[in-house]
């Protein structure tokens, strides 16, 4: 018989096709993202989705329009930027050029994201906020500059890279940095 669930780091049973808030745990998200390499592992050295997420939560603070938001809105958008790839902790990442041909995967990913949003009391629509997207794209440009080899063909149009440079973390450090940032932003486990 085929299994319809996976066991998480914390020992929970996670059902990707029917997730519930009880199945979601920030430590599982941090653990999964800390161990998941960006770019299908094709970067020059291991660089986790967890570290990418932490950096996106910082980069968003540098974007035009961020400071015009209220303090509560700024904190919340930083938390959203931190969690924007959280479903990948449970269902891994599928490269964008493939994902666009997998409508069922996109539906599963959306359902997992909705459940994560509900778990952490976040409006699901905020995951589509333009500043969150811009932070993600700024990280893409920065990662391209710092972590990828010479390009064989032009990439998509991207904003300017972030001014700082990326120094990849080991998975355990990425996990702990994610958890620390979650707490710093007022996330409630």
Named regions from a protein language model:
Residues 1-189:
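Metal-dependent phosphohydrolase cores
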């Amino acid at each position: 018989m085929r299994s319809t669930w996976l066991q998480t780091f914390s020992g929970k049973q996670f059902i990707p096709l029917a997730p519930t808030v009880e199945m979601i745990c920030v430590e599982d998200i941090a653990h999964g993202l800390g161990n998941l390499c960006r770019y299908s592992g094709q970067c020059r050295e291991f660089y986790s989705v967890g570290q990418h997420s932490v950096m996106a939560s910082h980069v968003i603070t540098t974007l035009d329009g961020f400071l015009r938001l209220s303090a509560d809105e700024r904190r919340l958008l930083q938390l959203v930027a931190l969690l924007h790839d959280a479903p990948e902790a449970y269902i891994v990442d599928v490269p964008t050029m493939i994902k666009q041909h997998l409508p069922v995967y996109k539906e599963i990913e959306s359902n997992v994201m909705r459940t994560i949003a509900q778990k952490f009391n976040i409006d699901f629509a905020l995951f589509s906020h333009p500043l969150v997207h811009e932070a993600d794209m700024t990280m893409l440009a920065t990662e391209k500059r710092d972590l990828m080899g010479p390009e064989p063909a032009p990439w998509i149009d991207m904003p300017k890279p972030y001014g700082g440079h990326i120094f990849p973390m080991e998975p355990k450090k990425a996990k702990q940095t994610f958890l620390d940032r979650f707490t710093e932003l007022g996330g409630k486990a």
